[in-house]
Regions:
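Short S/T/G/P-rich N-terminal loop/turn motif that feeds into the first structured element of a domain
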Residues: 1-51, 60-62, 73-79, 85-88, ...
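A short acidic (Asp/Glu
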Residues: 21-22, 66-68, 93-95, 284-285, ...
Length: 432
């Protein structure tokens, strides 16, 4: 099994060069915000291990909201983020990008502070890699190659299988045998591929096991202290929840139209959001701990198609900026934006509160998990205000939703079974 990983490179945009950067990024698209896989600057389609990628200018329109807490508006930079979700270690993917697309990357990064076009590109990229606070992968081990091969397999079988009803259950097993022979012939001829999974890297297995044990162990060690401090921590939390300002006005119509202009060109969409963490050590400490726990569940529990009860997210992550004064969230999800938000409100509003209620202006919560995102209008206004346009977005398998990936995988698994009953053969044929 090849595990997946994600990365985000962040660099400060040089003052006065943002407009030129945006114009360059626009040349990489075939549709608004949708990358041309073969664009001349960074041809994402040439990188066979890359699931998703994006380039986004992180210009936070809500920086002034923190003044509602009696804190002066900070002077924080505009950043450029290069983000990727890939098969295998993120470091290898970054190195591959630097080696094979160095000329285009230099054209992009020349708009950033401290970039030397004649210097070591890979070293610069590694130095600007941002550690992710938590990240989610829908199905650990499902590679780009597997997705494309199984999609081609489904199309080939669907075109071959007869549409007339079968005369008997026994005929289903015979037809399945014929289809297996057909696939074997197509694989031998090189027209189809069914590549077996690679061995799971030992280093990844060891790291996962250590992480599985280390976080609960740390929790046990700290438990006595938390019990002693819990009355004080609860008092601080409830005081802040009762007094923190809400900032949830409707988003400006022009901003909303700009965001919507970049959506719904495919069955999958992108989401990029940024916001300030509420001032004070308590909120900074609490959001850090909660994201450690969210990351733990994503790495060890939610690895097979679900993030809690939500099934429409391919990849997502949280990352801190500016010494944990700001938080970035990015995701790739199936369906429209409104349905995506409704999915969270109806199924895991408590999870939204855990992760995001530490942001300035979030709808007021109770006991950390209640209210907040459940106040639909306020939540939807809030998230749109904090959403940023994604200037360039790439996905390796357009037109294929997570439901399709699961369906295609079931077809392949049924094909590779050594023997099946007549009932199983009929059920498998119905998948086609």
């Amino acid at each position: 099994m090849t595990p997946q990983s994600q990365f985000m490179l962040v660099a400060q945009v040089t003052r006065g060069r943002e407009r030129g950067l945006r114009e360059l990024l626009e040349t990489m698209n075939s549709k608004p915000g949708m990358a041309d896989p073969a664009n001349a600057v960074l041809p994402f389609g040439q990188f066979e291990r890359l699931h998703f990628a994006r380039l986004a200018v992180l210009d936070d329109p809500t920086l002034g909201d923190i003044e509602a807490h009696g804190v002066p508006r900070p002077r924080l930079p505009v950043y450029l983020a290069l983000v990727g979700s890939c098969d295998g270690p993120a470091g290898k993917c970054i190195a591959d990008l630097a080696q094979r697309a160095g000329t285009g990357l230099r054209r992009i990064f020349m708009h950033c502070d401290g970039f030397d076009a004649q210097g070591d590109l890979l070293a610069w990229m590694q130095a600007h890699r941002c550690q992710l606070a938590a990240d989610y992968i829908n199905w650990v081990g499902r590679t780009v190659r597997q997705i494309k091969e199984e999609s081609a397999l489904r199309r080939a079988l669907a075109a071959k299988v007869p549409r007339a009803p079968l005369a008997s259950a026994a005929q289903a097993r015979q037809l399945r045998r014929e289809l297996i022979d057909f696939v074997d012939a197509e694989v031998s001829a090189g027209r189809l591929g069914l590549t077996p999974p690679d061995p799971t890297p030992l280093r990844w297995q060891i790291a996962k096991l250590l992480h599985l044990v280390a976080i609960p162990l740390a929790g046990l060690i700290l438990l006595p202290l938390l019990i002693v401090l819990s009355p004080l921590l609860i008092l601080i939390l409830r005081t802040k929840e009762n007094n923190d300002p809400e900032i949830c006005p409707p988003v400006d119509r022009a901003v909303l139209l700009e965001l919507q202009h970049l959506e719904d060109y495919d069955v999958t969409n992108q989401y990029t959001a940024i916001g300030s963490v509420k001032p004070g050590l308590f909120r900074r400490w609490l959001v850090t701990v909660l994201l450690v726990l969210i990351d733990y569940t994503c790495r060890h529990i939610f690895t097979r198609g679900f993030l809690a009860r939500v099934q429409t997210i391919h990849f997502a992550f949280w990352a801190f900026l500016d010494d944990k004064r700001r938080l970035v969230f990015m995701s790739n999800y199936d369906g429209g934006h409104e349905a995506y938000m409704d999915d969270f409100i109806n199924k895991v509003a408590w999870g939204l509160n855990l992760a995001f209620s530490h942001g300035v202006g979030w709808p007021r919560t109770r006991w950390l998990v209640a209210r907040g995102a459940r106040i639909e209008n306020k939540f939807k206004n809030y998230q749109r205000r904090h959403q940023l346009p994604t200037q360039v977005w790439y996905r390796a398998y357009p037109g294929i939703a997570l439901a399709d990936l699961k369906h295609n995988q079931r077809i392949r698994e049924g094909l590779e079974l050594a023997s099946v009953t007549e009932v199983q053969a009929q059920a498998w044929l119905r998948l086609l």
